[in-house]
Structures are given as C-alpha cells and as structure tokens.
Amino acid sequence: SQNATLRNILDAVYKMAVRKRKANESRPEGEKYAELQRVRLGSRLLAYLPLRITDELVGILRSFKDKASRVGVTQFIIQTHFQSPLEVTPEAKKAIEAILSAGWIITNQLVYTVAASGRGHKAKLRQTLNAMGVVCYYTFSVKGFHENYAVFAPNSRSLQEQQEEKVFGLIPKEKQKELYRLIRYERPLGKKLSGFLKENRLLFAATDRSVLNLPA
C-alpha cells in the first residue's frame, strides 16, 4: 500500500477511538463501549522489502502514536514475519531501528516449517531478533494438510525444540515482571532489551508461544 493509504487507515482508527471515548462520557456504567487500547499492524515488509520503510512512513507511525496515545491507546505493535536469521540484512536492521524510534514495538511470528525447524535455527533467530529489540511472539506449527504437507514440521519437532533449545532462553521467575514492564513501557526497546539479556546472562528471551495444531 501507499503511505497515503496507511495514513487514511490510521486516521480512521484514531477517529473511531475518539468517538468511542466521547460516547462513553454519556453512557452509564455497565453500558460503556470497549475503548481502543491496542493497534497492531501485520507486515512482512521488514523481511522482504525493508527499503519500503521510509522516513515518511515512519513519520506517519510516529504521528499516529502521538495523537492516539492521548485518547487511550497504549500499545502500538508491528507484527512481522522473519523465518530465518539470514533474512535479517543490514537493510532490515535499519528498518527495524527506524520503526522502534517511532515508539512502536516489533514482534515476530514464525511459521514452523521444515526449513525453519533445523537444530538451533529458531534459537539463532530469537538471538538475532532480540539483539535489535524485536520480541518473539509465537512459533506456529502448520496443520500438515494436503496444501502444506510438503513443508510442515510435525508437532513432535516443536515439542523437542521447546525442551532442548528454547529452554536456554527461559526467563527466571523473579525476572519475568521486569521483562514484562520493559516490553510494555520502555521505548525505544532495542538497547534496553539487549541490556536485560546481557545483565541476566541470557542468549535470548524465549517469549514466543509455541502454537501446536492438529493433525500435525
């Protein structure tokens, strides 16, 4: 989409948030509308076309965050889709830094295919993304039906990865609230997340949910 399209979409979202808040001023308790608290945009541009993340686009994101924060929106998320640490090019790093500078956070979803399920592959991806301030959101096992049978990794491999590889990034219980506050409130996140990992001697933060699907 063009920048103008994104600007129009975000303007519409902002106006909706304003309308709900205004309407709630005259509605009784128990009948108020649920107000907008989170905006999440899904895009794989960071992985396959990072040069699309221009100063103008980042400015649109920053401007929206500034005004939406004043009407109750507290979370601004770009959900992206890196499958391999090899996709994290210098251009991708620059794009990530630009978006983080606008006050948004970036989360990553991984589709757990055969190519992405090699020993140590996911651990390295977590480490690479965390080093730049990207939070791993979930690892998704596909169902293994006819349309994706040739590329799916079975649930057993995902379970093995959790027990033998993901375990090295588990956050100590006494540090979980600190990490939550960091991800939830600290902006820009990049160096702060790296500092947390270094301070706690962690290779990465295993924050991603491992989502299993049948009949895989």
Positions of the model-derived regions?
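Conserved strand-turn element in the central/C-terminal portion of the radical SAM core barrel
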Residues: 46-48, 74-88, 95-96, 100-119, ...
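Short, well-ordered alpha-helical packing segments
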Residues: 7-14, 96, 123-126
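Conserved Radical SAM active-site core
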Residues: 1-71
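Conserved catalytic-core segments centered on acid/base and nucleophilic motifs
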Residues: 1-2, 13, 99, 128-130
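Charged helix-capping and loop-helix junction motifs
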Residues: 56-59, 93-95, 120-125
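Auxiliary Fe-S-binding modules of radical SAM enzymes
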Residues: 123-216
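Structural recognition of alpha->loop->beta junctions
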Residues: 59-73, 101-102, 128-141
